[in-house]
Curated annotation (Swiss-Prot):
<dbReference type="Pfam" id="PF00696">
    <property type="entry name" value="AA_kinase"/>
</dbReference>
<keyword id="KW-0963">Cytoplasm</keyword>
<dbReference type="GO" id="GO:0005829">
    <property type="term" value="C:cytosol"/>
</dbReference>
<feature type="binding site">
    <location>
        <position position="62"/>
    </location>
    <ligand>
        <name>ATP</name>
    </ligand>
</feature>
<dbReference type="GO" id="GO:0006225">
    <property type="term" value="P:UDP biosynthetic process"/>
</dbReference>
<feature type="binding site">
    <location>
        <position position="58"/>
    </location>
    <ligand>
        <name>ATP</name>
    </ligand>
</feature>
<dbReference type="InterPro" id="IPR011817">
    <property type="entry name" value="Uridylate_kinase"/>
</dbReference>
<comment type="subunit">
    <text>Homohexamer.</text>
</comment>
<feature type="binding site">
    <location>
        <position position="77"/>
    </location>
    <ligand>
        <name>UMP</name>
    </ligand>
</feature>
<protein>
    <recommendedName>
        <fullName>Uridylate kinase</fullName>
        <ecNumber>2.7.4.22</ecNumber>
    </recommendedName>
</protein>
<dbReference type="GO" id="GO:0033862">
    <property type="term" value="F:UMP kinase activity"/>
</dbReference>
<feature type="binding site">
    <location>
        <position position="171"/>
    </location>
    <ligand>
        <name>ATP</name>
    </ligand>
</feature>
<feature type="binding site">
    <location>
        <position position="57"/>
    </location>
    <ligand>
        <name>UMP</name>
    </ligand>
</feature>
<keyword id="KW-0665">Pyrimidine biosynthesis</keyword>
<keyword id="KW-0021">Allosteric enzyme</keyword>
<keyword id="KW-0067">ATP-binding</keyword>
<dbReference type="InterPro" id="IPR001048">
    <property type="entry name" value="Asp/Glu/Uridylate_kinase"/>
</dbReference>
């Protein structure tokens, strides 16, 4: 039983890495993981929470290697944007199969595939109880999907950006490599910068800080973690102004 009968947040922006959709696969989308995530999002909708979603594209395309081999960075980033659209289509389909109304909005026009991003329409859809998936990043090269998540979170006036990762919060060091790494329950923006902790890229993080947007990092692969986060229970690491 939750200690809080009501959710801690009314409107959230959920950021999922493309890698989270891979599950144990080395590439692509694991249908079981996709369906589980859709069910967890459905739980939030049933709690009355308005949910915006941004998904990365790293499970389908990573431009760094090709950029090092000589590919133009802008071309690589455009390909990465299209990878996020593919993930968005998969998530929208999974939500529809779970009987959740969802809309997919893209920052680059893809007529007949998904809707163009429209700020006012997105807020209207969220208020009506639909999940809104934001694809194609910010629509600009040189911007990460973490930047897109913070930007969309600020635009839709979300109360928090929930960053779903493979680890259950922010640590003093990489917990996969250092067993003595310490997990933080709460941090200020300044502490993250001073300790040089890896939460997200600097452009995305400073955008969140400048607009007072809290970031909560948690393990999306941990069953029930998302629900615990939105109910205000102890889960993950909260980063905000102190």
């Amino acid at each position: 039983m939750s200690t809080n009968p009501k959710p801690a947040f009314r409107r959230i922006l959920l950021k999922l890495s493309g890698e989270a959709l891979m599950g144990d696969e080395g590439f692509g989308i694991d249908p079981k993981v996709l369906d589980r995530m859709a069910q967890e999002v459905k739980e939030l909708v049933e709690l009355g929470i308005q949910v915006g979603v941004v998904i990365g594209g790293g499970n389908l395309f990573r431009g760094e290697g090709l950029a090092k081999a000589g590919m133009n960075r802008v071309v690589g980033d455009h390909m990465g944007m299209l990878a996020t659209v593919m993930n968005g289509l998969a998530m929208r389909d999974a939500l529809h199969r779970a009987y959740v109304n969802a809309r997919l909005m893209s920052a680059i026009p893809l007529k007949g595939v998904c809707d163009d991003y429209n700020w006012a329409e997105a807020i209207s859809l969220l208020k009506s109880g639909r999940v809104v998936i934001f694809a194609a990043g910010t629509g600009n090269p040189f911007c990460t999907t973490d930047s897109a998540a913070c930007l969309r979170g600020i635009e839709i006036e979300a109360e928090v950006v929930l960053k779903g990762t493979k680890v259950d919060g922010v640590y003093s060091d990489d917990p996969m490599k250092n067993p003595e790494a310490v997990k933080y329950d709460e941090l200020s923006y300044t502490e993250v910068l001073d300790k040089e902790l890896k939460v997200m890229d600097l452009a995305a993080f400073t955008m969140a800080r400048d607009h007072d947007m809290p970031i909560l990092v948690f393990n999306m692969n941990k069953p029930g973690a998302l629900r615990r986060v939105v109910m205000g229970e102890e889960e993950g690491t909260m980063i905000r102004a102190k």
